[in-house]
From Swiss-Prot:
Main location: membrane
The protein's name: A-type potassium channel modulatory protein DPP6
GO terms of molecular function: potassium channel regulator activity; serine-type peptidase activity
Organism: Rattus norvegicus
GO CC term (a single one): cell surface
SS bond list: 405-412, 521-524, 530-548, 729-840
This protein's encoding gene: Dpp6
Length: 859
């Protein structure tokens, strides 16, 4: 019966599907009390042998049976005279042994490093910790509003205006008022007279939401509802201030409304919207998720006199229907436009309207280029009050054109063109302009030798009386500029973030924009335990806010730009630091592995009580889409932390071919063969770990979500060096299983246009891989209302698993979206994943052979 019980197909797990987590010592190879109590009694000989055999490989018990011969029994029955004992010799021998043992013990004590006894007093990280206030990182969301002032939100909830030079603080909004309004978000008007609050906010997709908005005079004014003239108590899709005074816009039913100042009636300036079909100033699903990476698709001119907005038309895009199973007798569906690989894409156009005087709508003209028959708009940025920069990307995503458009005529002039044999990466990043708009800085891929291209800063300068621009590189090297922050014309300096130190780090640099282009690291060794940063500058660049994101607990400090002097700490997250100090946090190590011509980074998480003599289970986590990064020095406390701290597992991550920030050669290796090279690199990482004596080779697992779920499922059947199973179990959360079922912009970027050559799509199907699954435990988790990766992917996968008689479990979340916005659902999700791996890593008692044979005979 045991073999039949172990092999099941189609079991749907609930919260009770996983047993109570065993102690960490059980995962390390010890036997838990439950197993001791439940084990079958053994005969005298088996009991005598078992303790001697318990120290075998992996710490698992072995059982031996020894047949007794007739001679043995005769020896026991025949009596004999006992020999005379030499008591003096025995005493001397015992004394010598005692002295030797004492010397050995003394040597061990003297030579062994002192153990951190404080670890035993520290708690282990739990799932509850992930959601507790003690572990909640507070981001003050500081925003510069002048040369010397910024606005931020303190931990208690109040909104503060702070002057850097005088160090004076003014409370703009009391935290109690925000609580009374049940506000989720706030925004202060540029003149600091009014605040805009949103409440009853409901998420739509990853970034978008709907909600009710009110305006309130600072500091104690009564709230007044923000509504279109024709509707009261309206639920808006967006509301936000402009760059000057009290001007604001809001979007209702995909139409744009403008209000010159608070108290004046709003007017509808764009009225072509159609709910769910034609979007004005907002992204549809595809643009929000894959192109702009934001729900906002409108952009104010610097002086507030004009507004650029995108019109996205989904009328020709096929409809996808998300079912809702609960809450009604009959299931209902929510339709929305979702373009899959090869299907019709949304069309997009860019418009500019004047906000002073009669509304005049002007469309910006796309490039007249046959390669741009179908295109995306990936970036919009105002250069001056009348010039707007636009990046146009063809559907194949291998040709982009950066233009500068005249907002008064709609004519666009090409400023730069880029082309790739694979795909173009980082196409939604904004350039930084000089005040007159004649000079701008942007990031592009520049050849740097054998490792391919790296992303560096280029300056483009317009020449008087010439149609040609002067192009010059500001930075170079085998590292990437990750973001241009700002340009200081007065000092001829450019400020940016880069990976020059290490790919897994981010530091703040400045570079001269004239002469030698000399650069300087501003954040290196500036703050302790801070190697991964982001930053923002005051309007005149005299001061900057430095946000340390790791490896230590995140902090925010304010510095003088000239001498980097720390002026004060804005947020130290002291309660998180204390909570971390009181917990057994994982030890983090970094290594590199050599795969063909590449040196790939690995990150290893070990238990705080790690010792080389124990045996630990191993979990490989594969995550992130091509161009992303899993190995970094950012601070994180996740469910993986719980698995390491509370359950004694070792977790490993590896940035293999296809990952970002290591050159375009490595990035583009995966083109048209997703999964193939990633499997090789991730398996090399596993093989490297299996060479370590402290890794239990019989307890190895893999996990991934989204694209990582595709990879984890792809990797799970992989064989080891002896053609045996490498992985004991694996799990995939919301896996992509067939790229022709996924978003057009994503699939076509890496596999080419579907319909022209479908071989890459067929080769990357998971159906070809899961047939090789044998007895590994496989947990699939998916929300039924997942708007990003439809449950259809999992349904197709399960069909193949059933055909292959695979050993799988399915856990669904009815009517839940992709991003699990509910805290309760996230807790349940994390417990389910942890519980699955704890059970997978449990060391089962090996029954004696005779007992096993009896079970088989009973079957």
């Amino acid at each position: 019966m045991a073999s039949l019980y172990q092999r099941f197909t189609g079991k749907i797990n609930t919260s009770r599907s996983f047993p109570a987590p065993p102690e960490a010592s059980h995962l390390l190879g010890g036997q838990g009390p439950e197993e001791d109590a439940g084990s079958k009694p053994l005969g005298p000989q088996a009991q005598a042998v078992a303790p001697r055999e318990r120290g075998g490989a992996g710490g698992r018990p072995r059982f031996q049976y020894q047949a007794r011969s007739d001679c043995d029994e005769e020896d026991e029955l025949v009596g004999s005279n006992p020999p005379q004992r030499n008591w003096k010799g025995i005493a001397i021998a015992l004394l010598v042994i005692l002295v030797i043992c004492s010397l050995i013990v003394t040597s061990v004590i003297l030579l062994t490093p002192a153990e951190d006894t404080s670890l035993s007093q520290k708690k282990k990280v739990t799932v509850e910790d992930l959601f507790s206030e003690d572990f909640k990182i507070h981001d003050p969301e500081a925003k510069w509003i002048s040369d010397k002032e910024f606005i931020y939100r303190e931990r208690k909830g109040s909104v503060i205006l702070r002057n850097v030079e005088t160090n004076n603080s003014t409370v703009l909004i009391e935290g109690k008022k925000i609580e009374s309004l049940r506000a989720i978000r706030y925004e202060i008007s540029p003149d600091k007279e009014y605040a805009l609050f949103s409440y009853n906010v409901e998420p739509v997709y990853q970034h978008s939401h709907t909600g009710y908005y009110v305006l309130s005079k600072i500091p104690h004014g009564d709230p007044q509802s923000l509504d279109p003239p024709e509707v009261s108590n309206a639920k808006l899709q967006y509301a936000g201030w402009g760059p000057k005074g009290q001007q604001l816009i809001f979007i209702f039913e995909n139409n744009i409304y403008y209000c010159a100042h608070v108290g004046k009636q709003a007017i509808r300036v764009v009225s072509t919207g159609k709910e769910g079909v034609i979007y004005n100033g907002l992204s549809d699903w595809l643009y929000e998720e894959e192109i702009l990476k934001s729900h906002i698709a409108h952009w104010w001119s610097p002086d507030g006199t004009r507004l650029a907005y995108a019109t996205i038309n989904d009328s020709r895009v096929p409809l996808m229907e998300l079912p809702t199973y609960t809450g009604s007798v009959y299931p209902t569906v929510k339709p929305y436009h979702y373009p899959k690989a090869g299907s019709e894409n949304p069309s997009i156009s860019l418009h500019v309207i004047g906000l002073n005087g009669p509304t005049h709508d002007l469309e910006m003209m796309p490039p007249d280029d046959p390669r741009m028959r179908e295109y995306y708009i990936t970036m919009v940025k105002w250069a001056t009050s009348t010039k707007v920069a636009v990046t146009w990307l063809n559907r194949a995503q291998n040709v982009s054109i950066l233009t500068l458009c005249d907002a008064t005529t709609g004519v666009c002039t090409k400023k730069h063109e880029d082309e790739s044999e694979a795909w173009l990466h980082r196409q939604n990043e904004e350039p930084v302009f000089s005040k007159d708009g004649r000079k701008f800085f942007f990031v592009r891929a520049i050849p740097q030798g054998g490792r391919g291209k790296f992303y560096h800063i280029t300056v483009s300068s317009s020449q008087p009386n010439s149609s040609n621009d002067n192009i010059q590189s500001i930075t170079s090297g085998d590292w990437d500029v990750t973001e241009i922050l700002t340009y200081d014309e007065k000092r001829n300096k450019l400020y940016f973030l880069s990976t020059e130190d290490l790919p897994r780090r981010r530091h703040l640099y400045s570079a001269n924009t004239v002469d030698d282009f000399n650069r300087q690291c501003l954040s290196c060794d500036l703050v302790e335990n801070c190697t991964y940063v982001s930053a923002s500058f005051s309007h005149n660049m005299d001061f900057f806010l430095l946000k340390c994101e790791g490896p230590g607990v995140p902090t925010v400090t304010v510095h003088n730009t000239t001498d980097k002097r720390r002026m004060f700490d804005l947020e130290a997250n002291e309660q998180v630091q204390k909570a971390i100090y009181d917990r057994q946090m994982p030890k983090i190590e970094y290594r590199k592995i050599e795969v063909e011509d590449y040196s790939l980074p690995m990150q290893i998480l070990k238990p705080a009580t790690f010792t080389d003599t124990a045996h630990y289970p191993l979990l490989l986590v594969v995550d992130g889409t091509p161009g992303s990064q899993s190995v970094s020095e950012r601070f994180e406390v996740t469910w993986e932390t719980v698995l390491v701290s509370s359950h004694g597992a070792v977790v490993v991550k590896c940035d293999g071919r296809g990952s970002g920030f290591q050159g375009t050669k490595l990035l583009h290796e995966v083109r048209r063969r997703l999964g193939f090279l990633e499997e090789k690199d991730q398996m090399e990482a596993v093989r490297t770990m299996l060479k370590e004596q402290y890794i239990d080779k019989t307890r190895v697992a893999v996990f991934g979500k989204d694209y990582g779920g595709y990879l984890s499922t792809y990797i799970l059947p992989a064989k080891g060096e002896n053609q045996g199973q490498t992985f004991t179990c694996g799990s995939a959360l919301s896996p992509i299983t067939d790229f022709k079922l996924y978003a057009s912009a994503f699939s076509e970027r890496y596999l080419g246009l579907h319909g022209l050559d479908n071989r890459a799509y067929e080769m990357t199907k998971l159906a070809h891989r899961v047939s090789a699954l044998e007895d590994q435990q496989f947990l699939i988790i998916h929300a039924t209302a997942d708007e990003k990766i439809h449950f259809q992917h999992t349904a197709e996968l399960i069909t193949q698993l059933i055909k292959g008689k695979a050993n799988y479990s399915l856990q669904i979340y009815p009517d839940e979206s992709h991003y699990f916005h509910s805290v309760a659902l996230k807790q349940h999700l994390y417990r389910s994943i942890i519980g699955f791996f704890v059970e997978c890593f449990r060391i089962q008692d090996k029954l004696p052979t005779a007992t096993a044979k009896e079970d088989e005979e009973e079957d």
